[in-house]
């Protein structure tokens, strides 16, 4: 039985296979527990954070903390049911009236907080069913929106009807929706034709390994795995004793002691990673007041 890994593998997902298919291939290397943070559509490539072993338990915190950077290409003049080039064309329209200045003005307007329409072909759920299943069954899908935050929006190049752009956005932003809404505002339709995730907090493509390389060299998996402590870089690391570890494993909150965190004064809501005497992650914790006492409350245990 191969040694089980506990950490993150930053994968450079190729365009074509689904995120689940990529995860399945890595699992065949002998890893029992495996997951990922932030699905990429089959058409999209780039950074996919693969979670191994105990790291599968930090997925929600990675997603909550992390912004993402995408570079994409769109094409004016048509609309599809999926809002990308892989869908069925539902409408075409002339685009020659559109200028580069028109495109740049709309991309600039993406900045800030806004309500974004969720694509009808997506994993978002309605009454427990993913929208894509309702769409494939020919059933009407409700219009759903979500709040997204975009801190960078730029046109990389414009060779109409093709436009290359880059955005830095909050987790869960649909880039297909940005392309679709741009097409509506220009009056000609638009579809996403290519997408690369360049960054998924806290890792970029410079840290990523191709799927082919990972599968071709299974003996190097361990050296490619990033420790859990590095996945949450802004969380304080708090060392605990064997006795304290026993309490944590029983779900008992630990008394807060400032000297455990470089004499940091107590503040509610501070998240940290507890490390055992070997500096192995034991649990994710958060400062809280329980029964009038200042404590580290266990959010998630990082053990089997």
Swiss-Prot record:
Alphabetic keyword roster: Isomerase, tRNA processing
Physiological role: Responsible for synthesis of pseudouridine from uracil-55 in the psi GC loop of transfer RNAs.
Q: Which domain of life is it from?
A: Bacteria
Q: Show the NCBIfam families listed in the entry.
A: TruB (TIGR00431)
Q: Which InterPro entries does UniProt cross-reference here?
A: PsdUridine_synth_cat_dom_sf, PsdUridine_synth_N, tRNA_psdUridine_synth_TruB
What organism is recorded for this protein?
Nitratidesulfovibrio vulgaris (strain ATCC 29579 / DSM 644 / CCUG 34227 / NCIMB 8303 / VKM B-1760 / Hildenborough) (Desulfovibrio vulgaris)
**Annotated active site:** 41 (nucleophile)
What is the protein name for this chain? Answer: tRNA pseudouridine synthase B
- The encoding gene is truB
Leading EC class: isomerase
């Amino acid at each position: 039985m191969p040694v089980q890994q506990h950490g993150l593998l930053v994968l450079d997902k190729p365009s074509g296979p689904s995120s689940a298919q990529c995860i399945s291939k890595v699992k065949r290397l002998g890893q029992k527990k495996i997951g990922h943070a932030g699905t990429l559509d089959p058409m999209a490539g780039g950074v996919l954070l693969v979670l191994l072993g105990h790291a599968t338990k930090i997925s929600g915190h990675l997603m909550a903390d992390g912004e993402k950077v995408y570079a994409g290409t769109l094409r004016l003049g048509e609309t599809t049911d999926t809002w990308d080039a892989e869908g069925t064309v539902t409408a075409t329209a002339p685009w020659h009236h559109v200028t580069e200045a028109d495109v740049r003005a709309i991309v600039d307007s993406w900045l800030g907080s806004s309500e974004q329409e969720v694509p009808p072909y997506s994993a978002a759920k309605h009454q427990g069913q993913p929208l894509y299943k309702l769409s494939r069954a020919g059933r009407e899908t409700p219009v759903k929106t979500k709040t997204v935050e975009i801190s960078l929006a730029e046109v990389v190049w414009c060779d109409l009807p093709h436009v290359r752009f880059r955005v830095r956005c909050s987790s869960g932003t649909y880039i297909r929706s940005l392309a679709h809404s741009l097409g509506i505002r220009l009056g000609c339709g638009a579809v996403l034709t290519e997408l690369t995730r360049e960054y998924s907090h806290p890792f970029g493509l410079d840290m990523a390994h191709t799927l082919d390389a990972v599968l071709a060299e299974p003996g190097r998996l361990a050296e490619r795995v990033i420790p859990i402590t590095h996945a949450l870089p802004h969380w304080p690391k708090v060392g605990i004793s064997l006795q304290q570890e026993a309490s944590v494993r029983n779900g008992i909150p630990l008394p807060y002691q400032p000297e455990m965190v470089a004499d940091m004064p107590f503040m509610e809501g501070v998240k940290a990673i507890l490390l055992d005497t070997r500096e192995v992650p034991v649990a994710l914790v958060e400062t809280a007041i329980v029964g009038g006492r200042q404590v580290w409350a266990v959010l998630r245990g990082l053990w089997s």
